Amino acid sequence: METVYFNGKFITKEEVKISPDDRGFLFADGVYEVVRWYQGFFYDLNGHMTRLKRSLRELRINWTDTDSFPDFAEKLIKINSLENQTAMVYLQVTRGAARRSHNFPKPDVLPTVYAYAWGFLPEVKLKETGIKAMLKEDIRWSRCDIKSVALLPNTLSFQEAHENGLKECIFVRNGLITEGSHSNIFFVINGTLYTHPESNYVLSGITRKNILRIAEDCGIKIREEAVEENRLRFVQEAFISNTSAEVMPVTELGGNTIGDGVPGPVTRIISDKFDNEINSLKG
Ligand code: PMP
């Protein structure tokens, strides 16, 4: 039986009751986080907590118990017997339930807090071959830095990729490559690692941040600078990053083969160093 966390309680998923007046349901008025459990610990929980607090602040959602998340996330792992597995915890916090109105509820209502955990098998094979992705105009709003649950442009775009047998949709805004529907993207051009800088047009990925740190430690030259779509023919390597895929090579983008069509050497170094870091944390 699956046990979830709902407004301070551990209950079964079937017992969860969310009001139809919940602003998450009516307006997608909420934020989320996803943290990964590596058979004994959450990777960079501090990074996720900092981003969660920022997202809540930007949406002016006042969840006073934010710091309880690490504790109940771990409890969810344990209650659901996932300690010895690779697992994820999803957290969603909405502004709460109040009669539908564009302005925020007055007086304040309590936010709705929901979290659940699940085990999964990492995509080891895909990391060897790399993935193919499509390119598409970035149809999202201009606050992509907030980890908001308003993901319709992301899901519509990802569905398009999925229906075409592709594993990700990479967005292009004003000729510049921003990020994927649920990942950040990196390029290697003449040995230099490029990724879009932190801005309101991308989500500041926790994996992205750690990759930049790892790459710097390896002495790889880094430029946090957007790559123009029309420079893609000069790209030798590409990879996407997120909490579930970690470092995932991209071998084809927008119908064009990247480099030799196989994961490249810089991607491999970064991916190996990332794996080493995880293994060293496992102790
Ligand atoms: N960008 C978007 C739009 C995302 O949805 C995600 C996944 N949450 C990322 C980037 C990667 O973030 P992270 O590395 O923290 O999983």
Labelled PLM ranges:
Residues 205-210:
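Feature captures the catalytic cores and cofactor-binding loops of soluble hydro-lyases/lyases
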Residues 176-198, 204:
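Glycine- and Gly-Pro-enriched alpha-helical subdomains that act as flexible
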Residues 1-169, 173-176, 199, 212-283:
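Conserved alpha/beta cores of soluble small-molecule-handling proteins
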